[in-house]
Amino acid sequence: MESQQLSNYPNISHGSACASVTSKEVHTNQDPLDVSASKIQEYDKASTKANSQQTTTPASSAVPENLHHASPQPASVPPPQNGPYPQQCMMTQNQANPSGWSFYGHPSMIPYTPYQMSPMYFPPGPQSQFPQYPSSVGTPLSTPSPESGNTFTDSSSADSDMTSTKKYVRPPPMLTSPNDFPNWVKTYIKFLQNSNLGGIIPTVNGKPVRQITDDELTFLYNTFQIFAPSQFLPTWVKDILSVDYTDIMKILSKSIEKMQSDTQEANDIVTLANLQYNGSTPADAFETKVTNIIDRLNNNGIHINNKVACQLIMRGLSGEYKFLRYTRHRHLNMTVAELFLDIHAIYEEQQGSRNSKPNYRRNPSDEKNDSRSYTNTTKPKVIARNPQKTNNSKSKTARAHNVSTSNNSPSTDNDSISKSTTEPIQLNNKHDLHLRPETY
């Protein structure tokens, strides 16, 4: 086509075409303004003919490359290198296209072109039907949303094109500091889940539920590099991108591992602060539990010195171990190993005292026999006095009779009476008691 134009106008050469893009000056004696009207008309007809041929030429027709041809379009300046991201994959804000983010509910500020998305992410219908997000989207984490940008375009046709989880998916904020990356990646993972991409997020074991597609990987890479500028990435993230600038999945996997590690650290601190020990469990098991927690915290960057560790351990001691609080509390250089030596000593002493006690248990039949042969010596003996009263009353009557007759009887009778008084009186009762007269 261009060769045909040049053949129609032999006065125009390639040198004049190159002059439009090169700095070389073309010397000619002809005044460029001295052009006849007939020449101008011929130029107009030729340009009209060239435009008609250009419109009828199919877009897919291959044009042979001409090394000497210079395009009349101005040369495009490549975007600057953005840290670990490659220059050929970077996109500027001017390359934004709202249709590429319509299915995900992303605003029009996302810089990637439609050809990077597969048809499954490219919704049908005109682009103006899809909602636009306010200018507050993509702001830093600490920046509040302005009140003027809280309006959304409502469209009934967009309901079927949006995700089934939420009508509007809010993108993550812009990362503004390496220290904010742990919080930012949480919002980014939440954004992927709301965008129906939760299946590609690594699970606890580090593997996703399903395999990520090429289009999803492109989507992941483009959104990550826009909302996480390289100058604000942590060092460990830059190290991953320096090996493979598209390995966003590895960054997400490492981030999830760090989240779980942070949760474990919090659990270890709570466990160490709430220790309880009274000797009910072996001292070895208690020591292993405590030392593992301290070592795990130290490895994760949370240093627990001996003084703090001993104070936390002693605070949870009870029973016979409680006195260790007062015997060791003045030792500033006490270590955890020394404290556990004392705990082991008390535990072994408890176990030795328990083993020294007799375990023999007497037979219940022996206890029954002993109770039968047992005589209570402390309990006084009870004697029934009723039979004695009748006998005593008789003896008193007989004595009174003897006394009354002794005054009228001769002296021999008195001698017999006095003789009888010195002899014991026999009482006929079942107890066979022998009472002397003086007791009356």
Swiss-Prot record:
Region ranges (Disordered): 1-88, 126-173, 352-440
Polar residues composition-biased segments: 1-23, 48-60, 127-152, 419-428
Gene induction: Ty1-ML1 is a weakly expressed element. Induced under amino acid starvation conditions by GCN4.
Biased segments, Basic and acidic residues type: 429-440
Main subcellular localisation: cytoplasm
Coiled coil (residue ranges): none
Annotated spans, RNA-binding: 299-401
UniProt site (Cleavage): 401-402
Gene Ontology terms for molecular function: RNA binding
Subunit and interaction comment: Homotrimer.
Free-text function comment from the UniProt entry: Capsid protein (CA) is the structural component of the virus-like particle (VLP), forming the shell that encapsulates the retrotransposons dimeric RNA genome. The particles are assembled from trimer-clustered units and there are holes in the capsid shells that allow for the diffusion of macromolecules. CA also has nucleocapsid-like chaperone activity, promoting primer tRNA(i)-Met annealing to the multipartite primer-binding site (PBS), dimerization of Ty1 RNA and initiation of reverse transcription.
Comment field on protein domains: The C-terminal RNA-binding region of CA is sufficient for all its nucleocapsid-like chaperone activities.
Name of the protein described by the UniProt record: Transposon Ty1-ML1 Gag polyprotein
